[in-house]
Structure formats: structure tokens, C-alpha cells
């Protein structure tokens, strides 16, 4: 009886400890952060060009993808003194925030790849910290709202923003992908952090994706595709030994007719850096717009 009582007591203690651990984990889990995303059309790619290239760049985007623009203006969008031309480009395949600084660009601006609109700014900044991101630029006011710059594990910089008056953009025809290159050493930390923050899901995780996608057709690499209310995100985990221009493209734009889109792009002064190739259920090309912005453009190859 004593042995049975001892085992029973041990079992009860183990169960109590397990329940305590689960409870503590639930209280502290990054997965419990609030979902503060709005919609993919508010995930803006940030593009910095020289002021003299500004109009030509915006014009080439419009000629390639179509869409509309906001009124161009000159603003201070950093917490320290600066001056930049700024314009929003709303295309059916993605939204871009274009900057043409007339003054030196304060650090670390210019290194952020995208801006995410959030429903609750303070909660978003706290969620970023909770899920493992660094806050590189603490919250500050801009002419139309509030901003901060965060950095995910792996060195990926992102702007979080909130507008005093909520914007209203048309839903996109196709959702672009934020293309993030990270090292194999940091890919797990980046993915865990981003998933917890974004409430996203892994759509695919291919440990042997075709290397032609990163300019190395004889090799393979790891490609992870994630989707959330912020939009699509593709993680490219590589050894960093990439031929130009791979790694410079920030966004991949999905179109219905790649040859027609590339024809429009060429006519608008866009240079095709990597001719179309087919891999991973898409046909894709890499292009460079006037002003230097490099992008991937693709169409589904299984339609």
C-alpha cells in the first residue's frame, strides 16, 4: 500500500507540474500577441531613389503595372531633421512608398524593406519586442501618424506605421511577396519571430528548392513561404554566395501575363536583368527600374 501511495503521490505531483508549465507557457507565449494586421494592400514596399530619378521611376511603375498615385509632396518622415520627396504608388499588384531624399538620409532609414500598417500602434511595437524583434527606432510622430523601425532576427528591417485617419485602399488583384534573404543560422529564429508577430502560417517549406531561383541552377536551397494578413512573405535561406542581382530584390510581383508585363516594362525603360525562367510552379524574371529599384516579377506556371 505504501508503494502504491508513493507512486500515486508522484504521479499527482508530475501532473500538477505539467499543468503549471502549460499555464506559464500560455501566459508568456509570443503566440498570444494580438493580431494587429490590416490587409495586404497596406504592406508597402519602401523604395529610395535619387530626387532626379523620382518621376521617371514612378512613371515606369505605372506604365508596367497600372494603378494610381497619391499627390507628390516634400515632407519630414524621420524623427530627426530631414527632407524627402514622397509619393504612394497604388498598383493592382502591390503598394509602394517612394522616397527621394533631398538631404542626407538619417540612420537607419533606407534599410527598411517594407512598412506594415497596424490597427494598434503601441500593441504592435510591444508585440514586436515580445516576439523577438529589436526596436531600432522607437515610436515617433510623422505628418500623418506614428512610426517605428524594427529588426527581425536575421537583420531584416521593417517599418510599423499607423495613420491618424485610417487609409482606404482598393484590394489588390494579386498579393506580392516580401522576399527575405536570411542565413541558415538565423532562419529558424526569423520564422518563429515573424509567425508569432504576424499570426501567419507556413504555406510551404522546401529544403531542396531549385537553385535557379537564386541564380545557382546546379544547387538547391531552402525556401519557406508564409502567408498572413500582412500579405505573403518568402524566406530564402542561403549561404550568401549569390550572383548579382539575387538578394537585391525586395518584392516579387505576381502578374497574369509575364511576357506582356515585361514588354510594357521594357518600353518604360526597365532593364530585364534575369530573363524569364520556370521553376517552383512559376515563371519569373528579375528587373531593374529607372532609379535602381530591383524586383522580381512572376506568373503562375500551373494556370
Residue ranges and their predicted role:
Residues 161-166, 297-303:
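Short beta->alpha transition motifs characteristic of CBS
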Amino acid at each position: 500500500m505504501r508503494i502504491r501511495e508513493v507512486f500515486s503521490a508522484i504521479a499527482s505531483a508530475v501532473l500538477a507540474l505539467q499543468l503549471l508549465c502549460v499555464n506559464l507557457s500560455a501566459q508568456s507565449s509570443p503566440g498570444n500577441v494580438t493580431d494587429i494586421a490590416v490587409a495586404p494592400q497596406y504592406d508597402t514596399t519602401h523604395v529610395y531613389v535619387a530626387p532626379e530619378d523620382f518621376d521617371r521611376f514612378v512613371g515606369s511603375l505605372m506604365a508596367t503595372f497600372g494603378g494610381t498615385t497619391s499627390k507628390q509632396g516634400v515632407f519630414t518622415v524621420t524623427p530627426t531633421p530631414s527632407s524627402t520627396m514622397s509619393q504612394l504608388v497604388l498598383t493592382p499588384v502591390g503598394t509602394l512608398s517612394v522616397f527621394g531624399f533631398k538631404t542626407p538620409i538619417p540612420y537607419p532609414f533606407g534599410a527598411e524593406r517594407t512598412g506594415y500598417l497596424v490597427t494598434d500602434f503601441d500593441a504592435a511595437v510591444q508585440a514586436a519586442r515580445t516576439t523577438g524583434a529589436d526596436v531600432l527606432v522607437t515610436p515617433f510622430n510623422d505628418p500623418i501618424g506614428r512610426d517605428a523601425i524594427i529588426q527581425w532576427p536575421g537583420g531584416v528591417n521593417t517599418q510599423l506605421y499607423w495613420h491618424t485617419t485610417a487609409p482606404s485602399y482598393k484590394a489588390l488583384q494579386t498579393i506580392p511577396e516580401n522576399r527575405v534573404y536570411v542565413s541558415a543560422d538565423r532562419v529558424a529564429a526569423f520564422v518563429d519571430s515573424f509567425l508569432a508577430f504576424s499570426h501567419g502560417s507556413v504555406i510551404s517549406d522546401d529544403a531542396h528548392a531549385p537553385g535557379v531561383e537564386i541564380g545557382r541552377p546546379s544547387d538547391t536551397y531552402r525556401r519557406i513561404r508564409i502567408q498572413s494578413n500582412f500579405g505573403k512573405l518568402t524566406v530564402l535561406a542561403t549561404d550568401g554566395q549569390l550572383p548579382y542581382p539575387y538578394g537585391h530584390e525586395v518584392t516579387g510581383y505576381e502578374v497574369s501575363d509575364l511576357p506582356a508585363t515585361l514588354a510594357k516594362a521594357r518600353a518604360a525603360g526597365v532593364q530585364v536583368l534575369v530573363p524569364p525562367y520556370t521553376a517552383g510552379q512559376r515563371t519569373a524574371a528579375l528587373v531593374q527600374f529607372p532609379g535602381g529599384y530591383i524586383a522580381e516579377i512572376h506568373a503562375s506556371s500551373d494556370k
